[in-house]
């Protein structure tokens, strides 16, 4: 069977169509939300799975008016198993300033001459061009200097709260959480994604955890829509910036 090669025009047309697919969703309308049924949170809630360790059932105290279970009034309401929900508090207020200044200089000189050596320099001087002499045969001077200066100044402030779902419980008891939030304002959709690993004992009694107690934390705050499209360079310009060496 013979394989047909695509022409350059066909390839260019295909690339143009593919580059427009990401924006076709919000062409002339507001961007669509991501379906909840496709999220890992939905899967974790739908299939909580079996516990890794089976705990023996505690006997019921008939003399007490309160139940000791998680769903009771005095029970522990914190997230602890797959499918449970907790609140992630993100309060980032960071400021960093770095300044470096480097100066380096070096100089050296070397000279070599043979004014007297058994009369040989005088014999050689007669054969050399006018002005040349063995008394100052070699002289080398060198110098180098370099300097550098750099500074970094950044400031970030972000305050958010998002509900996350326990998507997995590791064998050591650590909880793997994932949370997402979408907010659409006019023709712009803001997206907040958070994921990481937390210890059950770090979760507060209010079923909340701060971002600085999340291991391998991944926090993404961005969006998609008409404003984001205008802020980004065109795909052709991005390709040229990557390919052109000047």
UniProtKB/Swiss-Prot annotation:
Predominant cellular place of this UniProt entry's protein: membrane
Domain of life: Bacteria
A Gene Ontology term for the protein's cellular component: bacterial-type flagellum basal body, distal rod, L ring
Signal sequence, renumbered to the chain: 1-20
Protein's recorded name: Flagellar L-ring protein
GO molecular function terms noted in the UniProt entry: cytoskeletal motor activity
Lipid-carrying residues in chain (S-diacylglycerol cysteine): 21
Topology in the lipid bilayer: Lipid-anchor
Family: Belongs to the FlgH family.
HAMAP family reported for this sequence: FlgH (MF_00415)
Functional note: Assembles around the rod to form the L-ring and probably protects the motor/basal body from shearing forces during rotation.
Lipidation (N-palmitoyl cysteine): 21
Keywords for the protein's UniProt record, in alphabetical order: Bacterial flagellum, Cell outer membrane, Lipoprotein, Membrane, Palmitate, Signal
Subcellular location: Cell outer membrane; Bacterial flagellum basal body
Pfam families from the UniProt entry: FlgH
GO biological process terms on file: bacterial-type flagellum-dependent cell motility
